[in-house]
Amino acid sequence: MEKRAMRMLAMFVLGTSFWSCAGFPVYDYDPSSLREAVGASVAKVNSQSLSPYLFRAFRSSLKRVNVLGEDSLSMDIEFGIRETTCKRDSGEDPATCDFQRGYFTPSAICRSTVQISAEKVQDVWVRCRWSSSSESNSSEEMIFGDILGSSTSRNNYLRGLIPDVSRTEPLYERSLETMRRFPPPGNRSFPNQWPRARTNTGFE
């Protein structure tokens, strides 16, 4: 029995060695890679938000890694962001800025997908759930990414973008007419209070 177990262990070691030598990429996910991906995600938010202050990340964690090729992969990350005391046009590194204090300081929990190729960040997509700055307990979601379209101001801090082409399609007009004639089920006297995801592209 012991000899059989040793034989199986030896076969397992040889098998893993074979796959490593057969060209399958082996990645070492050190903390610096995670910091770089989080930094790129925060930079995407800061580049497309309308807040006069920079946001800084806190409590980041790696959720998933997808190998795309021999030298490329994507990382799914979850992290929090909070507004800092540094002005957006100050040129400061958000990681060196102090967080603003106060109960109503803008903050959010975000999930991002960062594509890395040849050890360089190639693409970043971020989705954040923002806590409301009002006295209500409502929240809203925003999507930050590089999608072509025109911008429309959505609130004091963030921009939600809707491609112009979708507004010119007959299907879009028919959908609006259907919504006017047949409101969604539930209490028809009050608007829908569920937060909606918004797409942010950064193009004016």
Swiss-Prot record:
Pfam (any one): Spp-24
Any one GO cellular component localisation term in the record: extracellular region
Posttranslational modification: Multiply phosphorylated at serine residues. Phosphorylation sites are present in the extracellular medium.
Cysteine disulfide partners in this protein: C86-C97, C110-C128
Signal peptide: 1-23
Region entry Disordered, spans: 179-204
Keywords: Disulfide bond, Phosphoprotein, Secreted, Signal
InterPro entries, alphabetized: Cystatin_sf, Spp-24
UniProt-annotated location(s): Secreted
GO BP annotation list: bone remodeling
Modified residues (Phosphoserine): S90, S138, S139, S166, S175
Family as reported in the entry's similarity comment: Belongs to the SPP2 family.
Purpose: Could coordinate an aspect of bone turnover.
Stated name of the protein: Secreted phosphoprotein 24
Lineage, uppermost ranks: Eukaryota, Metazoa, Chordata, Craniata, Vertebrata
Gene: SPP2
